[in-house]
A protein has these predicted regions:
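N-terminal strand-loop element at the rim of the active site
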Residues: 8-70, 152-155, 160, 167, ...
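A short helix/loop element that forms part of the nucleotide-sugar donor recognition site in Leloir-type
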Residues: 46, 178-191, 327
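A short, active-site helix/loop in glycosyltransferases that binds the activated sugar's phosphate group
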Residues: 140-166, 174-176
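Nucleotide-activated donor-binding/catalytic signature segment of Leloir-type glycosyltransferases, i.e.
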Residues: 237-251
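Aromatic "clamp/platform" in nucleotide-sugar-dependent glycosyltransferases that forms part
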Residues: 268
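Short hydrophobic beta-strand element within catalytic cores of glycosyltransferases
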Residues: 276, 285-288, 298
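Conserved acidic donor-binding segment of nucleotide-sugar-dependent glycosyltransferases
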Residues: 300-301, 305-312, 320-325
């Protein structure tokens, strides 16, 4: 079969699971190229970008900006005209808005939802309405719509976006990170050696709700917590963290998950949380709020504990795992085995290849 030329478009490749998901697909499938903007502000670019061929879209950013977005559209049009892709594969809302708005073309369109913005409290009601209407219209221009988790797909279809036959789910393929001895990892990150550590790792933005972790920690002053990540809330979280919470900013995930004993997520909204899968592959039990596809990663009572966003429930879950080393060990082992089975790189890449072949065989 001839090489399928795929142009992937994403607004920015900031540190996180989405960037790694996209990079792995681009890197593994011949004929793939990545078009992306620049990471701005407090965030930094994911190191995975260095492994793939990148075309920079100078004026493409995450926020809506009519002037810059028009310039970005022109840039994207020029890239498409020069590259002549068989498929334009957009990722996340902003890139999907721009990449799917261009008229005509001989190429097929695919869009991947790595989550959605309907539960993001940083967006106004009007902004969410604009997003919903845009997604409904743009879905009609796609040959295929992909979600990274089944729950996310259900929530999008509930908004009447796309037709049932337009959707497939492709879970991420996640590689186990290099493992380090706990003592060495804690030395690397300047963490205490004699405590059970509860680790939180994410972007420090409102949708990840780091403030909820601080509420939990305040109720458990005898438990040690460590928070890793950067973002616009980093300084305020540092300033308000109680004494039993160490906020270390950006951290190498391989050392972080090797250093802690329990992983926790307090997000208000999620797609498919790759960081939690990495934590499971590191043999950690996971506590996660029941949002997005978290419950597809964490099997409640078997590989960790899934809770509501209630402080009381999160406190109880942390207290239970901190007090029970045998339970932590059993859940961690079960989580590692399940993550290896459910989130293989081979499965993710094969599913994308099949998706590309499928859309090229259709008329739409």
């Amino acid at each position: 079969m001839c090489t399928i030329k795929v142009l992937h478009i994403i607004a920015r490749m900031n540190v996180g699971g989405t960037a790694r998901y996209v990079s792995e697909v681009v890197d593994a499938i011949p004929g793939s190229v990545l078009a992306t903007g620049y990471v701005q502000g407090a965030e930094i670019e994911d190191s995975s970008v260095s492994a793939v061929k990148v075309i920079r879209i100078k004026h493409m950013g995450r926020k809506i900006s009519p002037f810059n977005d028009l310039l970005a559209l022109v840039e994207i049009y020029k890239v498409i005209r020069e590259f002549q892709p068989d498929i334009v594969h957009t990722h996340t809302f902003k890139a999907g808005l721009l990449g799917r708005s261009l008229p005509g073309g001989q190429y097929k369109r695919i869009h991947t939802f790595h989550g959605h913005l309907f539960a993001d409290q940083s967006f106004s009601t009007l902004a969410k309405e604009f997003i919903t209407i845009s997604e409904k219209l743009l879905a009609n221009r796609c040959a295929l719509l992909i979600t990274v988790g089944a729950k996310v797909g259900e929530e999008l279809r509930a908004q009447e976006i796309g037709l049932d036959q337009d959707w497939i789910s492709i879970p991420p393929g996640v590689k186990a990170l290099p493992h380090h001895e706990k003592s060495a990892a804690r030395t690397e990150l300047l963490l205490p050696h004699d405590a059970v550590l509860v680790g939180w790792m994410a972007r420090m933005t409102s949708v990840k709700n780091p403030a909820l972790l601080l509420e939990v920690a305040a109720r458990l002053p005898e438990v040690n917590f460590v928070m890793a990540g950067g973002g616009d809330l980093l300084e305020s979280i540092k300033a308000s963290a109680p004494a039993n919470v160490k906020v270390i900013g950006w951290s190498d995930a391989q050392y972080f998950w090797s250093a802690v004993d329990i992983a926790i997520s307090t997000s208000d909204n999620e797609g498919m949380p790759i960081a939690l899968i990495e934590a499971q592959l590191a043999g950690l039990p996971v506590i996660a709020t029941d949002v997005g596809s978290n419950a597809e990663v964490v099997e409640d009572g078997q590989t960790g504990i899934v809770t509501s966003r209630s402080v009381d429930e999160l406190v109880a879950a942390v207290a239970q795992l901190v007090a029970d080393k045998a339970l932590r060990s059993a859940m961690g082992a079960a989580g590692a085995e399940r993550a290896q089975r459910e989130f293989s790189m081979h499965q993710m890449i094969s599913a994308h290849k099949e998706a590309y072949e499928r859309v090229l065989a259709t008329r739409r």
